[in-house]
Amino acid sequence: MKFLTIIGLLLCGLLTSAQDNWVAPESAKEVVNVYSENDIATQKGAKMYQKLCWTCHGKTGQGNGPAGSGLKPKPRNFSLGEVQDQSDGELFWKLSNGKGMMIPYKHSLNEDQRWQLINFIRTFKK
């Protein structure tokens, strides 16, 4: 029984570390945000964030939302360099495809809405 418990814990650890090393494909880096620095798009993104994202990622994007407290791994802190240093295309790919507890939005948000959300996520940069 101890053996199965140890194997289970190891597998959980591997899954958690796989979530932490989330890398978009190289091709995503080159995708350009057509709404970059568009204030109206950013405002629309803010409204979507309040509807879809804040419960896990928090009102200030620090990964401390009420629904995210019990998640493993924790939701991303959007103000950190590990997020902000990625290209818009990489963030768009991750938002579109999801992973683990992060659901894919490519079926529920159109491309314009996803770019608008990326614009708003950029406002969390320290």
Describe the role of every protein-language-model region.
Residues M1-L9:
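Sec-dependent signal peptide recognition
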Residues L9-S17:
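Hydrophobic h-region of N-terminal signal peptides that target proteins for export
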Residues Q19-D20, W93-S96, G100, K106-K126:
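C-terminal capping alpha-helices of c-type cytochrome domains
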Residues D20-M48:
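Electrostatic cytochrome c docking/interface patches
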Residues Y35-S36, T42, Q62-E90:
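Gly/Gly-Pro-rich "capping" loops immediately C-terminal to redox-active cysteine motifs
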Residues D39-Q62, S96-N97:
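Sequence/structural segment immediately N-terminal to covalent heme-attachment motifs in c-type
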Residues A41, M48, S87, L91, ...:
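Stable alpha-helical elements in mature extracytoplasmic
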Residues K51, R76, G100:
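Glycine-centered loop/turn positions within well-structured domains
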